[in-house]
A protein has these predicted regions:
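Serine-esterase "nucleophile elbow" of acetyl-processing enzymes
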Residues: 1-59, 69-78
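Substrate-gating cap/lid alpha-helix
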Residues: 133-167
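Histidine-centered active-site loop/cap adjacent to the catalytic His
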Residues: 161-163, 182-211
Length: 211
């Protein structure tokens, strides 16, 4: 179903969604995939303003952090499309700080967020998969944690009839033709090209002519 100017799109997640947004300015979208999506949709709107786009990404967030602010930052805005991108920090904190985020607890929390939104809003739910493009040898070890976590994201999305944007697959395909660092210099945070690829994957999955 195509996005139209009556829609309110809300994006929430970690630093990949935040992308340097100005938190003192509610209209700030940052310089990442959210901005790219908004720019594309607004360019299509001709003389109209296009859909309302809200960015509630926050650096460093894990899934539990989203739960603590979900009502204020999501439900209260009454969006028609909610996009959630989370998971990489739940993995990363295990390796840089020894903070464990058990996959079953992660999945249960994510499921609660999606189910709560479905109960309270008539909104389309969209989940963007976490991803990793290793640029150091030790980052390859992260897949031990990230792979089952990605599976948990997919299960929670399926259980709550959320659309899935496979950012992980889009970026891995792109990495077959160029260095991973061109897409995510530290393996986690996308470059402008990486953000554009995520935006393109979202538009292909969500802004579709299919019913």
């Amino acid at each position: 179903m195509r996005i139209n100017e009556k829609d309110t799109l809300l994006f929430i997640g970690d630093s990949i969604t935040d992308a340097g947004r100005d938190r003192t300015h509610s209209a700030s979208l940052g310089s990442g995939y959210v901005q790219e999506i908004a720019r594309t949709l607004r360019a299509r709107a001709d003389a109209g303003p296009g859909p309302v786009v809200i960015n509630k990404g926050l650096n460093g967030n894990r899934v539990y952090d989203l739960e603590s602010r979900w009502t204020t930052d999501v439900i209260d805005h009454r969006p028609t499309v909610v996009t959630l991108k989370i998971g990489i920090n739940d993995t990363w904190r295990r390796y840089d700080r020894g903070i464990i985020s058990p996959v079953d607890e992660f999945e249960a929390c994510l499921d609660r967020l999606l189910a709560d939104t479905a109960r309270k809003l008539s909104a389309r739910l969209v989940v963007i998969t976490p991803f990793l493009l290793p640029v150091t040898s030790d980052q390859n070890d992260w897949y031990e944690d990230l792979s089952p976590r990605t599976d948990a994201v997919l299960r929670a999305a399926l259980a709550n009839e959320a659309q899935v944007v496979r950012a992980d697959l889009a970026l891995l395909r792109a990495a077959e033709e160029r260095a991973a660092a061109e897409l995510a210099p530290d393996g986690v945070h996308p470059s402008p090209l990486g953000h554009r690829l995520i935006a393109d994957a979202w538009l292909a999955a969500v802004d579709s002519v299919r019913p």
